[in-house]
């Protein structure tokens, strides 16, 4: 597959043209990549008005992912989330009242800032009480979604869309096919934050990508699981989305810089050639190595590694339950760090490791050696290790659902605010969402009154201060 952006920039760098244009480094500098860092010069196209090499590269990505249309972002899925919500708002019927989005509660804070910027309300989908034991995970069954939509209809409210995160930070995958069928039966678009799942289209057993499973709008953080520089992402449109080319590019431009990174654009462009060539084979090798490691861990410490297989598990994320070792997630992450392995995420219970198709045999061997050593040294599972308590999340959900909303998300985010100790925040209006990052998933959302039930979760996830609306 051709790489028009990469080819253009390399030719330009080889010409040694006198650069009387931005950026200021003029193709020279300490990093060594400066000669490939350009701006929208003649022939370089423009990301938000693409008609040349960028449009050609995006057409390649569209073909690879099998979507109706795929667009690039150099500012991560956060930009794509805002853009697809803007597009969904434009698709709703005129004079439909105040807009509301039905969203799973484990949404990234980018959704909340989109709500503040676009001024819509959210109606939250909470997990069933017995499935609510982790901040990152919010399983939603099709039957529960259908019931929630029926309840909103009985109140005379119709959401402009349904929003899900899948896969989530711990590797849980929603039933996108079943949930999309419910959405479409109600005449609603399904929007999916697939930031962690760009690779799902390239599985040897067939695509598990949300667009192929019925989602209407979807974002992928290419940089999370593909060989792409940080910030590279995709906005995917399904065939049901009727927005014209200008509307989509304007939606992205509304939330993006007028100086997109050409290094990231080249990275997205170069990835097309990799995806079209050897990526599926490399991905399969990575999955085989990961499966072997999980089987070894199951033999060493049953329950340590969460399953990689099954309809609700993603196959490229190794999630470790540190309680199986009598450790906290943070302790296990530190033990790995001391042995030369840096994890993606750790909380009081879990550690998340994210290998990819680019992970080498030597890197897997290092991880294997580290985990074998830790398993050999760690005590047997200690019941004193604090487990995630489903009752704590269920209590928070009940408290938040029962309270009247005094501020919209927009009003709370834009209001004068102050930082106070989290323990003193009860009864105050949350201004900025209270999150730990990663995973940047709020415990209390902007506009909600902080209930006492939030305090144990603040403590558990290390949130010591809260931004509240000034009184």
Predicted regions mapped to residue ranges:
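Short active-site oxyanion
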Residues: 68-70, 97-101, 443
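Structural signal for conserved beta-strand scaffold positions within catalytic alpha/beta enzyme cores
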Residues: 72, 124-126, 220, 345, ...
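Conserved N-terminal alpha-helix of the aminotransferase class I/II PLP-enzyme fold
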Residues: 34-79
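Conserved C-terminal alpha-helix-loop-beta "cap" of PLP-dependent enzymes
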Residues: 298-452, 457-462
